[in-house]
């Protein structure tokens, strides 16, 4: 069930955003894409998610041509650095939204949402409005929504960058526990960061990118 990127090139202007990227990601592992701002991290994640089409190259997942699969059919979840939630919905409704879109069984939705809420430490916050939550809590909602989907690929684009130091430290530790647990052993986790110390603390494989090219 590995995710394989082969010779991915994306050059929308006179500069490469992705320059001949070839990578292999295995399930049950945490990968950190480390690079400065505008190094190509977000572009790489968006390409995997299907939000951006490369000029050339290929992506294979589960022995299928991933580039040929529409975005809405890819089993991918993405957490952004901005707190992206549905402001008109409460915490529980935010988390269950993608499951209802899939028309899943209500009992299964209830269980998956309850499990996700428990994992991110939001038990008791189910009826809270998004506007009533702190930045850290809002990011937990976004993470819980991704976990409830049970996506096979979870992409995290600098998810802690807009939080204060104490919140970053706490959530980083929770990420490590979540992504190394047995329940998530079949998923691939790719985390983008500009911070070398954060990359080391996450205890995963570190991939360095600069000017759209993999350095190590």
What are these regions (language model features)?
Residues 129-133, 137:
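Conserved ABC ATPase signature
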Residues 49:
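Helix-to-loop junction immediately C-terminal to a conserved catalytic motif
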């Amino acid at each position: 069930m590995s995710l394989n990127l082969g010779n991915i090139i994306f050059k929308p202007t006179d500069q490469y955003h992705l320059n001949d990227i070839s990578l292999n990601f295995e399930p049950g592992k945490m990968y950190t894409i480390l690079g400065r701002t505008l190094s190509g991290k977000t572009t790489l994640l968006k390409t995997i998610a299907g939000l951006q089409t490369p000029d050339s190259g290929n992506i294979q997942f589960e022995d299928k041509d991933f580039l040929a699969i529409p975005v809405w059919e890819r089993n991918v979840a993405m957490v952004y650095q901005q707190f992206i939630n549905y402001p008109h919905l409460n915490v529980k409704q935010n988390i269950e939204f993608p499951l209802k879109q899939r028309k899943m069984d209500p009992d299964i939705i209830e269980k998956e949402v309850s499990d996700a809420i428990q994992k991110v430490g939001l038990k008791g916050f189910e009826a809270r409005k998004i506007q009533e939550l702190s930045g850290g809590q809002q990011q937990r909602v976004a993470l819980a929504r991704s976990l409830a989907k049970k996506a096979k690929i979870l992409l995290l684009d600098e998810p802690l960058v807009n939080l204060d130091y104490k919140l970053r430290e706490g959530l980083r530790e929770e990420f490590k526990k979540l992504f190394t647990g047995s329940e998530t052993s079949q998923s691939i986790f790719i985390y983008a960061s500009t911070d070398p110390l954060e990359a080391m603390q996450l205890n995963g494989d570190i991939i360095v990118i600069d000017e759209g090219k993999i350095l190590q």
